[in-house]
Swiss-Prot record:
Involved in cell size determination. May serve as a chaperone for expansins through the secretory pathway. Unlike the tomato GP1, the BURP domain of AtPGL3 is not cleaved when the protein is secreted to the cell wall. It comes from Arabidopsis thaliana. It is found in: Secreted, Extracellular space, Apoplast; Secreted, Cell wall. Residues 411-625 form the BURP domain. GO terms for cellular component: apoplast; plant-type cell wall. InterPro entries: BURP_dom (IPR004873), PG-associated_BURP (IPR051897). This is Polygalacturonase 1 beta-like protein 3. GO terms for biological process: cell wall modification involved in multidimensional cell growth; plant-type cell wall modification. Its main location: secreted. PROSITE patterns: BURP (PS51277). The gene is PGL3. Glycans are attached at N124, N141, N277, N370, N387, N465.
């Protein structure tokens, strides 16, 4: 009896202790926040086990742990083991705080009157505006300032006559945007489609125009200020755009201007069309590495006129491919004026351009000096000021060439890290969707290799040729890229994996640091107190940078010969502390490419200078504890 009493007393004492630690109780004496079986609690224990006691625990890293509760974590782990996660994908995405596109179902909504959509978001338009006579629909401030934006327009304005569509400030200032236009304006007569300020200032924009204005008669499309100042997306794909059209004018003005790594693909564009009139003005100008592909563009067309003016002008590098352009066409006129005069030389490839054409006139004026012509029409081509190299770069007082695409302050010299120095601060704000790590119990059951891309896409509901499919492919491919000279790298999707990688390189006595906030971004700041990590000596370090992926994924790597600093950042006029930044200086740049942005900005060559940069918001730096 006494023994049973003592056992009961011990058990009661155990429960009491758990309640005291947990605070509010639920289901057995644990709180929702402190349940020891949650992924977050597991991560805390893992940190305490793997990192030596004198190293401060990083609440920053702990905050990125999976928000799944104990029950959901166990449930989704079992589903992952059984390859059944897709059956609960919406629930999994929401509960685990993942980055996912919504599954848009078909909509049969119709309308007979003019419609104005203002401050609208996330909609599927199917069979919308079909066979309408006259009228106009206006999309203004649509999907603006969103995070993950997905819109679908299918069979919109099909067989309509004189029907106008206006997309103004559409998808602006959003992050990861995907819009699909299928069979839009097909067989329409007259009317106009106007895209103005479309997907401007967007991170990772994607638009797909399939069978857009196919078989249209006199229906014009205008794209103005389209993907202006956008960043790193697949861009736009135009498939069978204006195919079999009659007198269809299309105008692209300020398209992709000042954008970063944006691509466009034109496939079967204007094919078999009659009297098409396409104008590309200031297309891809001032951009960074724009890539555009024209495949089977204007093939078998009749009396078409295409004009490329100030195309990819003052851009940095960039590549264009023209395959079977104006092939087998009749009386086609193509004018390239001031084409491809990029800041740094890009390349153009013309394969089968104008081949088999009759009575066509192709004119090149002030064209790029770096082009390849294969199976090119020999007759009817005029080259004026061809292969003339123009200097469009800006120069500063010391004669160094400065590329406008290298943001001031993105790269700097070690000598700038001195108290009192005024330095431009780049935009260090994290522009990726907010996500969390997955717990190790789930991530170890998910595929992650290029050989299993199909399975990965199935899990995350990424259909073929979708934006999400491209995001997944890009991330996995980059993670499998062989390391550069002297680099040790690993992609991690759980905090435990990051801890393992950092400690494998640096040992178990480590400190995790990140820049405190984003104050001072895109402004001039004053360097305050500076502290060199590990005495400011050459040291080892591990830097982890976010990769875009459904769950929180970091590309972690260690390179030799670096110095790491932490510095107070002061407001320019008041000298008040506004931030505490972490900077890393690469002392050996000999293996870097000569076209690296650091050398364009600082005016040097690989191996001749050290290069420093800040650790951006939500990126991390691991160093050996002092």
């Amino acid at each position: 009896m006494l023994k049973q009493f003592l056992l009961l007393q011990s058990f009661s004492f155990f429960l009491f202790n758990v309640v005291i630690v947990g605070g509010r109780t639920f289901g057995g004496g644990f709180s929702a926040e402190e349940n020891p079986f949650t992924p977050k609690a597991s991560l805390v224990r893992y940190w305490n086990k793997e990192i030596r006691g004198q190293s401060p625990r990083s609440e920053f890293l702990i905050s990125k742990a999976s928000p799944l509760n104990a029950v959901d974590s166990a449930t989704f782990s079992k589903l992952a083991a059984a390859n059944s996660l897709p059956t609960r994908f919406p629930d999994f995405c929401s509960a685990a705080n993942l980055f996912c596109f919504p599954d848009l179902g078909a909509s049969l909504e119709k309308h007979d009157d003019d419609v104005k959509f203002s401050v609208y978001d996330q909609k599927n338009f199917t069979n919308y505006g079909n066979a309408r006579a006259g009228g106009a629909d206006s999309f203004k401030n649509y999907s603006k300032d969103g995070n993950v934006v997905t819109d679908s327009f299918r069979r919109y304005s099909r067989n309509a006559a004189g029907h106008d569509d206006k997309f103004t400030v559409y998808g602006e200032n959003s992050n990861v945007v995907e819009e699909g236009f299928n069979s839009y304006g097909t067989f329409g007569t007259g009317g106009a489609g106007d895209f103005t300020n479309y997907q401007n200032n967007v991170n990772n924009p994607t638009s797909r125009f399939t069978a857009y204005s196919d078989g249209g008669n006199g229906r014009s499309q205008t794209f103005k200020t389209y993907t202006h100042e956008a960043n790193a997306g697949n861009g736009q794909s135009f498939t069978s755009y204006g195919k079999n059209g009659n007198g269809v004018p299309n105008e692209f003005t300020s398209y992709g201007v000042s954008s970063n790594v944006i691509g466009s693909g034109f496939s079967n564009y204007g094919e078999s069309g009659n009297a098409a009139n396409d104008t590309f003005t200031s297309y891809g100008s001032d951009g960074n590495v724009p890539q555009n592909n024209f495949n089977n563009y204007g093939a078998s067309g009749n009396a078409a006129v295409d004009t490329f003016a100030n195309y990819r002008d003052k851009a940095n590098v960039g590549d264009d491919s023209f395959s079977s352009y104006a092939k087998d066409s009749n009386s086609e006129k193509v004018n390239f004026v001031n084409y491809g005069q990029s800041f740094n030389p890009g390349s153009e490839t013309f394969t089968g351009y104008g081949k088999g054409a009759e009575g066509s006139k192709l004119s090149f004026k002030t064209y790029t000096p770096n082009s390849t012509f294969k199976d090119y029409a020999k007759k009817g081509v005029a080259f004026a000021k061809y292969n003339v190299s123009t200097t469009t770069a800006n120069t500063v007082g010391d004669g160094k060439t400065v590329n406008k695409w290298i943001e001031p302050g993105k790269f700097f010299r070690e000598s700038s890290l001195k108290e009192g120095t005024v330095i431009p601060m780049p935009d260090i704000k994290d522009k990726m969707p907010k996500r969390s790590f997955l717990p190790r119990s789930i991530i170890t059951k998910l595929p992650f290799s290029t050989s299993k891309l199909g399975e990965i896409k199935r899990i995350f509901h990424a259909v073929e040729n979708s934006t999400m499919g491209g995001i997944i492919t890009d991330a996995v491919t980059e993670c499998e890229r062989p390391p550069s000279v002297g680099e040790t790298k690993r992609c991690v999707g759980s905090a435990e994996d990051m801890i393992d990688f950092a400690t494998s390189v640096l040992g178990r006595s480590v400190v995790l640091r990140t820049t405190e906030n984003v104050a001072g971004s895109k402004e001039k700041v004053v360097i305050g107190k500076v502290n060199g990590i590990n005495g400011g000596k050459l040291t080892k370090a591990v830097s982890c940078h976010q990769s875009l992926y459904p769950y929180l994924l970091y590309y972690c790597h260690s390179v030799p010969k670096v110095r790491v600093y932490e510095a107070d950042l002061l407001e320019l006029n008041s000298k008040k502390k506004i931030n505490h930044g972490i900077a890393i200086c690469h002392m050996d740049t000999s293996s870097w490419g000569p076209s690296h942005g650091a050398f364009l900005a600082l005016g040097s060559k690989p191996g001749r200078i050290e290069v420093c940069h800040w650790i951006f918001e939500n990126d991390m730096n691991w160093a050996i504890a002092d």
